Amino acid sequence: MHLFYTPDIEGDIYTLNADESRHCVRVLRLGAGEAVSLVDGKGTWYEGVIERAEVRGCEIRITDRRELY
């Protein structure tokens, strides 16, 4: 599973910025329906599923949140 840093995550849908989206779609070749992990740098780990895989904005639906520390 792939991990992305998302310092400003809120709500149940998160859109990766353009650089992260391009990396996700073009380099890692991830697409809709694939699972990813996200971390906010404040101690919370998120699990999600890619809803829309586009180079300019990859949309992820958050399925689980865990406070790690």
Regions found by a protein language model. Name each.
Residues 1-69:
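Acidic/glycine-rich phosphate/pyrophosphate-binding loops and surrounding catalytic core
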